[in-house]
Amino acid sequence: SANAWVYPEHRKLALLSMEQLSPAYRLQLEQIWQKARTGYETRLSPSVLVSNQGLKPTQLDYASWSGIAGDHSCSPSDMLHNVLETDWIMKVAGIAAQLEYDLAATDNRSKRINAIRNSDIRFQRADLVYSNRASANNVHFLLARPKEDTDPQTYFTACLTEGASLNAIGMYTRYHLSALYKAGKSSENGLSEKEQSAWLLAALADEAYADHFLQDIYAAGHVA
């Protein structure tokens, strides 16, 4: 649904992007994941990506974080809490897996819309503040251009200027830069394994949150 990505589509976009990494970068990502999941082995998947999670996933891979970010959490730290500490997030993952199956099973527009609406109802039952997050602000959308002939540099500056309305480009930039900072902190000398793991986990959370909004930028219904 290119008008607005749903959880399984966010997850699929993340999955495809990571599957296309070079072998060296994929190995590096796997190594980061292994360090970050220390202590959370029962909740987080053994591999950073799970291509076929089935209809009832019992663990969350990194690709799923892009679906959870933004729609089922309000910040990277909130997302981490939901991913690692809540029971309902696994219900959400199962609903998303069923939605992915339902969307793949038909090209009929009405049936696809019904599948999405049914999943929204089920998401709301599992995640009680699901609809509240969606209606809180316009953060998932692109900032409207001041003028039709606004050039790219002026537009991006407007998106990132202090006081600008919340917007997808601003959110992506903020959390991507934060992820880079935290990844850098994880490599500082003198850190214990627990401290390094915490920095890497936080960096992965920030990047997944950033990626959710990067994906939203390319949803047709999110363009002002």
Tell what function each PLM region has:
Residues N3-L201, A205, V223-A224:
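N-terminal, motif-rich segments that launch catalysis or mediate targeting to/interaction with membranes
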